[in-house]
Curated annotation (Swiss-Prot):
Keywords: Cell inner membrane, Cell membrane, Membrane, Transmembrane, Transmembrane helix, Transport. One of its GO terms (molecular function) is transmembrane transporter activity. The gene is mdtH. SUPFAM superfamilies: MFS general substrate transporter (SSF103473). This is Multidrug resistance protein MdtH. The keyword Ubl conjugation does not apply. The chain crosses the membrane at residues 13-33, 34-54, 99-116, 139-159, 165-185, 214-234, 243-263, 277-297, 300-320, 340-360, 368-388.
Amino acid sequence: MSRVSQARNLGKYFLLVDNMLVVLGFFVVFPLISIRFVDQMGWAALMVGIALGLRQFVQQGLGVFGGAIADRFGAKPMIVTGMLLRAAGFATMGIAHDPWLLWFSCFLSGLGGTLFDPPRTALVVKLIRPRQRGRFFSLLMMQDSAGAVIGALLGSWLLQYDFRLVCATGAALFILCAAFNAWLLPAWKLSTVKAPVREGLGRVMADKRFVTYVLTLTGYYMLAVQVMLMLPIMVNDIAGSPAAVKWMYAIEACLSLTLLYPIARWSEKRFRLEHRLMAGLLVMTLSMMPIGLVSSVQQLFVLICTFYIGSIIAEPARETLGAGLADPRARGSYMGFSRLGLALGGALGYAGGGWLFDSGKAMNQSELPWVMLGVVGFITLIALWWQFSPKRSASGMLEPGA
C-alpha cells in the first residue's frame, strides 16, 4: 500500500472517531434546549427559537470565513480552537437564566462551529476519493443518527437531575475532541494551493452555479431544523413527558442504521443526485404538513418516521452534490460557503418556526406552522426543479455514480 493510500485509510478512521465525539457532544445538549427553556422554565418558543437560530446563523453564515482561513493556515488550529469555543458555549448555557445569556452561549457555540465545521468537511473531500464520497457521507450520517440517539438518551437522563450536568457533559466531550485533534490530527493543508483568504472567497462568489445551489437549499433547511425545535415540543406536548423525545431520536437511529446505506447504494447508480434530493424533500414536505392535526403519539411518530425517510433519501445526495461542485483550489472556502443555506434556513426555520408555533397556539390553530413549512417545501422543490432542469444542467451537474 502506498503512503498516500495509507494516509487516506487512516484518515477515514480518524474522521469517523472525530465525528462520533462531535455528534455525542452536540446531541447531549441541543435537543433538550427547547424542553428546558420552553417547557420547564416557561419561556416563549420565539425566545428559544432566536437562540437556536443565532447559533445556526453564526456557525453556518460565517463558515465561509472559517473555511477560507483554514485554506490559508490549515485545518488543525481551526478545529482545536473551535471545539474549545463550543465547550465554553455549553458551559455558559448551563448557567443561563435570562434570554440574553442563552443567546450569548449559543453565539459562542456557533462561533466554535464556524471554526471547526468547514475544515472537517473539507478533510472528507480531501481524503475520500470522489467515487467513494457518497457512501462515506452515508456512513457519517448513520453514525450521526446513532450518536444522536445515544446523546439524547444521555442528556434526557441527566436532565432529570440538573440541566447544568447536561451542559457540563457536552462541554467535556468537546474538550476531549479538541485534545484528540491536537494530539492525532496531522498538519494537513486543505487546498491544492496556499492562496490568500480573499482569493478563496473570490473563487466561491464567482461560481454562480454553486452559489445558486447553496441559496436554494435555504428552504430545505427550514424544514430540516425542526427536529431541534418544533418536533421535540410536539412530542413532549402530546406524550406529556420530555422522556418521549428520546424515542424520536431512537426512531431516526433505527431507520438510518437500517436504510441509509442500502438506499444510497441502490439509488446512486439509478438516479441523478438532484433527483434524489428532490424526491427526499417531497417526502419531508408531505409528512410535515399534517403534523398539527394529529392527536396521538402513534400518529405523530408515523409522520416523524416518514419525515426521516425523506431525509435519508435527500441527505447523502445533497452532501455529495455540494462536494462534487467544490473547486479543489479552495476546498475550505467552498465547504464554508456551502453552509450558508443552512445558516439562512436555520435562522428562518428556528425564529420563524418559533413565532409561528406561538402564533398558532394563541389563535388555537396548531396546524399553522406545519402548513406554512409545507408551503416552503413546495417552493423549494420548484426552485430546485428550475435549477436542475435539462436546459440549465446541460453543461453538467453530476451524473449518478460520478
